[in-house]
Design a protein with these regions (language model features):
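Short conserved segment of the HATPase_c
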Residues: 82-94
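Short helix-loop "hinge" at the ATP-lid/N-box region of the Bergerat-fold HATPase_c
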Residues: 54-56
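Short beta-strand/loop element within the Bergerat-fold HATPase_c
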Residues: 62-73
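A conserved beta-strand-to-alpha-helix junction within the catalytic ATP-binding
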Residues: 1-16
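Glycine-rich phosphate-binding loop
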Residues: 101-110
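Conserved micro-motifs of the catalytic ATP-binding
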Residues: 36-39
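Glycine-rich ATP-binding loops of the HATPase_c
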Residues: 118-127
Length: 143
């Protein structure tokens, strides 16, 4: 079992340093109980890292990045210009219309594959000017 909170605590300082030039404002919230998933540690690190990197790469300068964990979920929200195609977003090599040159289009496809192998659901939605990625345990998934 892997604590997503611990993975985030290790990854966030380095990732925020790498993207500090974008002046992204990070808001991190967590509950007393961590979000623990049944997954190989290396795969959990790749899953979380790909989601956070995606939210940094595709954020605007001076944008927001909200990362929240509960005992049953991880929510990552970042500033955006417009909604993305939720059907195509998790496909390999998918790039949005304004796709970034430094994006391979693989990160979210890999994240979704790891999530599925760990009985997790990874979904996307557009909410109030923010891209929202939600990772939940399949047993906790709400319709």
């Amino acid at each position: 079992d892997v604590s997503v909170d611990e993975v985030l605590d290790e990854l966030l300082p380095d990732l925020m340093d790498i993207y500090e030039g974008k002046k992204i404002h990070l808001v991190r919230t967590k509950e007393t109980e961590p979000f623990v998933i049944r997954c190989n540690l290396s795969l959990a690190q790749i899953l979380v890292s790909n989601l956070v990197k995606n939210s940094l790469v595709h954020n605007r300068e001076g944008g927001e990045l909200h990362i929240a964990t509960t005992p049953s979920s991880l929510t990552i929200m970042n500033s955006g210009e417009h909604p993305l195609d939720g059907e195509k977003l998790f496909r390999r090599f998918y790039r949005s219309i304004d796709g970034k040159k430094d994006s391979t289009g693989l990160g979210l496809a890999i994240a979704r594959s790891i999530a599925l192998s760990a009985s997790l659901s990874l979904t996307y939605k557009w909410q109030e000017g923010m891209h929202l990625f939600l990772l939940v345990k399949e047993s906790q998934k709400k319709s």
